[in-house]
Amino acid sequence: MERRTPWLCVILSAVIFGCMPLGANFLYAQGVTPMSLVFLRNLLSLPVLALLCQKQGGLRISRGALLETSLTGFFGCCITPILLFSSYCYLASGMATVFHFAYPVIVVLGGLVLRERVQKKALFCAVLCSLGILLLIDPSGAVDPLGVALALTSGVTYAVYILLLAHFRHREVMGFRMTFYMALISAVCMFFLCLFSHQLCLPQTLAGWLAALAFSLMICIGAVMLFQKGTFLIGAQRAAILSTFEPITSIFVGILFLNETLTPRILLGSAITLVAGVFITLGGKKDEE
């Protein structure tokens, strides 16, 4: 069971992230802007994360760990969600998520650039995932070039985040402390960005605030921490490929809750992506054995 834990962490993280557009679109209807949503996502998780840190030995962190956490958090919890959430304003959430998922291939290519050992099966799975993701794109849907550019760029910045996470040196702070400081630094940066760009728009109803709190806790304490734990143990390439469960979740959430249709193309794309995910998971277990 312990060997399966990191793989399950990444998959569960992807499923939670896949439900993210539902919460984002609800909060947009409450008057929240994409930049404000990133700010709230990080800010509202801080009290709970601080309490959890106290149970794990406190908030003390070295300067080196803080600098590395700041850089990692900037890409993972600041710039990536700004780009992705902004793309939801121009594209259907499912399509935006699909374009965002250029990053498994980028991570594998990044591994080659960093002269990591890239296994042939990882490269094959990345190509297979890309094929599956392309099939999930609705060719009849309206595609806004700005939305596509935002979503694709979010994939690039997220790939950088995964590579930074996999090579994170100060692993003594992994867990609640790392997540707390990533959220804190991102919240401070986003507050000033929202102020200077006049994008600080908060929920106007109690339901909006409760939704923002639930959104924050699910993402920062649920999905982000699960993804960190899994990536530390199985590496950037496998984590990126397994994360392709996210667009599948987004599409099926849309079918179940947003009255979107299920087509043979979607079924085929989902099946190919799932096969790639299962293949890389089983291959990883054999390597460990």
Residue ranges and their predicted role:
Residues 1-36, 40, 140-167, 188-189, ...:
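Glycine-/small-residue-enriched transmembrane alpha-helix faces in small-molecule transporters
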Residues 16-21, 50-96, 135, 216-234:
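Specific transmembrane alpha-helical segments of multi-pass solute transporters/efflux pumps
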Residues 27, 37, 41, 87, ...:
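Hydrophobic/aromatic residues within transmembrane alpha-helices
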Residues 29-79, 104-110, 157-164, 179-198, ...:
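Transmembrane alpha-helices of multi-pass small-molecule transport proteins
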Residues 48, 53-54, 103-124, 248-268:
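C-terminal transmembrane-helix exit sites in multi-pass transporters
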Residues 49, 118-138, 190, 244, ...:
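Hydrophobic transmembrane alpha-helices of multi-pass small-molecule transport proteins
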